[in-house]
Amino acid sequence: MKQGKKERMKRVKLIVAYDGTNYCGWQIQRNGITIEEVLNKTLTGLLKEPIAVIGASRTDSGVHSEGNVAVFDTENRMPADKICFALNQRLPEDIRVLESREVSPDYHPRKQNCIKTYEYKIVNRKIEVPTMRLYSHFCYYPLDVEKMREGAAYLVGEHDFKSFCSPRGQAEETVRTIYRLDVIKTGDLITLRISGSGFLYNMVRIIAGTLMKVGMGAYPPAHVEEILDARDRRAAGPKAAAKGLTLVSLEYETELEKQIQGENKEWKYTLFQDEIVSRGKARLLIHRCRQEDFERLLIRTVHQAVRNGALRVYVRDEEGDGRIIPGKPYGFYVFQAAAEDEGWYVTEK
């Protein structure tokens, strides 16, 4: 670069695969080496400028990845699609960048709607296979796969997964949507393949530990529904070992869903997003909701619409018992009666 001439800043997206055995997870920390730290140091050396990557999924210590996503900004003139090849020559052999390409400056891997897919592998036989020991959980007790599938079915859909997460210091919304949860048996290998809108801290590992309990006969399959209802970590099974877990992929939505529906025993709602792009407007119909869940549902779904680009969100509670109070703060949002639509309340970003 010529002195005094500033190159154009560009944002580069990476698809990162790694064997997490020797790393203390993704995120930089004091007590050990991490994937993020190695990427930052290697990119800084390659591009001759300070680099700090932003990762989509902050996997835990010992967890593997086939397709985590990261981005960084650089002024270096190296073509974005060539960075992966140069980077892989410098990275340790247990980390590889599968793809690098330029993306728009406002692209953020954590703020885009995406479907995350994980796999949890269980070797179910009397004697452990040495070649699988770093990438699977070993269980010598015979597991009933059909019962595991029955138990897994209760977890599909939108639920409060508070029972299936390890508590952390900060308060966290615990409602998530699981789109699919398959229990696949191939010889002695059982694979749990799970896709969802996002996952709580240790959620997949606790689901794996719970379904193994079901497979052992310690819990009947229907007990999984009782665990969900308890909303208490102590109700669920143990947290399975990190080494069996692999982040498989992150699939980002290219188009905004026109309509989102959520339904379970506790609530049912429809979020209409078809006017967000044209008019900055979304509508939320709450068909039914338990009183104790109402405020959380309201805040969470309105926030989702705002995150997706809505400037105004109109809400109607079809049970109509005065649960939306004009002027009262609901998280970051305050509602007023919508002058143009009787029975609707509106909040603005």
Task: Describe the residue ranges of each PLM region.
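Structured-RNA-binding interfaces characteristic of tRNA pseudouridine synthases
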Residues: 2-268
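Beta-strand-connecting loop/turn residues
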Residues: 186-188, 280-282, 342
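Short beta-strand/loop segment at the start of cytosolic alpha/beta domains
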Residues: 269-278
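N-terminal acidic leader/helix
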Residues: 278-289
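A short, charged, amphipathic alpha-helix used as a generic interaction element across diverse proteins
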Residues: 295-303
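Acidic, low-complexity, intrinsically disordered interaction modules
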Residues: 302-338
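C-terminal edge-of-domain segments
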Residues: 334-349
